[in-house]
Amino acid sequence: MKLSRRDFMKANAVAAAAAVAGVSAPTLAANLITSTDKTAITWDKAPCRFCGTGCSVLVGSQDGRVVATQGDPDAPVNRGLNCIKGYFLSKIMYGQDRLTQPMLRMTDGKFDKNGNFAPISWDQAFDIMAEKFKTTLKEKGPTAVGMFGSGQWTVWEGYAAAKLMKAGLRTNNLDPNARHCMASAVVGFMRTFGMDEPMGCYDDIEQADAFVLWGSNMAEMHPILWSRISDRRLSHQDVQVHVLSTFEHRSFELADNGMVFTPQTDLAILNYIANYIIQNDKVNWEFVNKHTQFRKGVTDIGYGLRPTNPLQQKAKNPDSGDSTPMSFDDFAKFVADYDLESVSKLSGVPKDKLEKLAQLYADPSKKVVSYWTMGFNQHTRGVWANNLCYNIHLLTGKISTPGSGPFSLTGQPSACGTAREVGTFAHRLPADMVVTEPKHRAIAEKIWKLPEGTIPEQVGYHAVLQNRMLKDGKLNAYWVMCNNNMQAGPNMNEEGLPGYRNPANFIVVSDPYPTVTAQAADLILPTAMWVEKEGAYGNAERRTQFWHQQVKPPEGAKSDLWQLMEFSKRFKVEEVWPAELIAKMPEVKGKTLFDVLYANGQVNQFPKEQSKGALNDEAEHFGFYVQKGLFEEYATFGRGHGHDLAPFDQYHEARGLRWPVVDGKETLWRYREGFDPYVKAGEGVRFYGKPDGKAVIFALPYEPAAEAPDKEYDMWLSTGRVLEHWHTGTMTRRVPELYRAFPDAVLFMHPEDAKARGVRRGEEVIVSSRRGEVKTRVETRGRNRPPKGLVFMPFFDASQLVNKLTLDATDPLSKETDYKKCAVKVVKA
């Protein structure tokens, strides 16, 4: 879309009116230019490049460069508002160290694992990549090649990657960095409901009576949603906000009931609430009897560590997600052990605060939304935490209805739309299908026009296991795209860097900037970013949003989609598929993987002319409307069974649509009659992801963390983010205003803990764990206020790699890393 000056000024007026109405008004970005008459700025819409909220922005470009951004007043998510990061989106692509040429480690003009980076051509880059991948495939087979992708990939980039890896190279060693943030939510949804992603939407905010935050600092991590919650709370005196965390943060400033609990004891608190509901006869029996079943989960499942780790060897049921049926009475007996007295003692939360929280959930007149993010998910029992929260909503019937429901928030712009829905996990296929299910593989092979048996049934290496296999020399040709896992991954010293520098391995990193991960690689490929390409993201409320390419990338930088498809041309089918597989479909003989995967009569069916009116480098290069072909093929996976997506062209007109989209209408609340087209008249509620239409209430206990403070390492360490920076700071630290606002990471610490160590605010300390150490400065004031015995350190700072300290323990069911709990000691530097 192109806006006239009048339209643009009108948009500003709408945003101003929203501010007058009581919503915090945005301050326009310092570089925003408003007179299109004088500057001839072209405006178009795009979703924000940062978190999973899915705010829409207006992007202003001039002379081939993005020069301004503003919150989109027509966007239902953010209603014209931006957070501080969104204000400066126009600057994220223009860091001085932007990469524009492939770079290979070389000595004397030849590849050398220990050489220095030198520029090469794209042909040279793909030549050596193809050589290394082909050699690995020939000598070790498909299990020795892999890819680490991203919840920041566009939908079609993730889909193209899934096709290349799972079908083309015939390996499931594809996993996204969303494994580190959303995998526990995925498994939690699947176990309880049989389908992934939230049943509610952001419209719940304006209809809820109360909000409960479980391990989610929405004030800094989802500030636009927090502005809507704040507006609801401050405009309605009876609305309540309850916040639970292992330390106080900015969200506590609005809390009616703030609770700081001992790490890992959220499990016990959740069971206490279920017990309170039962003991006080607040169970919604009509709902429970009709729509739920009870099961007891297997316990003592380990901590996702290496099999040689003593903790893993001690586990009686390592990695087991099994469960057995149980009655309501047995469930009631199970949670009866979690009484107010014992849970208060275990968690450290005063009894009156716990009881106030339980009363809120139990009150049938109160509509409650539960929000959580990494506090639940990055947890060695993260799946259990998700399941236990669902228990509370199911026992009370406060679910799938306007203003009530559990809601897992996402941290990346397309962790839902790309990682989860497309299925770029090591065990998944599109639309909740999995590689271990023969019927699902058959569906994928049919849609992709592949011979039976192309997709392997073996689950691939998940994120943490990929690093372990790199270190052990079992994963040898490896491509990292659109993430900075060397900085973001756990236990960097022992399990991260060794694999990248293993002489047996060839590591490729695609990125716009020379990140920590890129600098550990053998080959770096320069990447186009955000509106330098056409894209699609899926946000936390199931909203799929499209954008057009609005500017060209720097000469030499190519989109991830271009890289994936162009690289596929380097492989003949005979080089990667066994003869018996080719014999099932002789017509593929002599073809390249590009021909089979992307020129299959479906992906290439739309002429490039259909993308006229906007830039589209990929359409021009490949000769067809690549994005439309990939999307329409992908959409066939979900249509007709609850994952319906609208036709491609509809998304370019809308500000996003929430799936399932049936007959052009989006779905706001799933599983509820009157809102969800898959629930028939008279059913009321049906959790149709389960064969019997019933959700599962699980009996699951409190179990301790993998590592806790002891005499030597006497403090808990929790890691996370801050408002001004996003993840590893690759983009935000290159924005001068954001860098100045929070230039360096610090260690947030209780003043008495600092005093006991002879440390004053601002002084340097050494933080060490059993795995490594970092030097940083202490902060005893400000936004984060840890209790005694716990410290918090953000991970955005490449000069202070906090993940040298963290433990690579994971949830055994989801394989998601626990970044919130390990033991450290702090001494004055």
UniProtKB/Swiss-Prot annotation:
EC number(s) per entry = 1.9.6.1
Q: Name one GO biological process term.
A: cellular respiration
Database matches in Pfam families: Molybdop_Fe4S4 (PF04879), Molybdopterin (PF00384), Molydop_binding (PF01568)
How is the cofactor bound, in the record's words? Answer: Binds 1 [4Fe-4S] cluster. Binds 1 molybdenum-bis(molybdopterin guanine dinucleotide) (Mo-bis-MGD) cofactor per subunit.
Q: Which NCBIfam families match?
A: NAPA, PRK13532.1, TAT_signal_seq
What the protein does comes down to: Catalytic subunit of the periplasmic nitrate reductase complex NapAB. Receives electrons from NapB and catalyzes the reduction of nitrate to nitrite.
Q: What is this protein called?
A: Periplasmic nitrate reductase
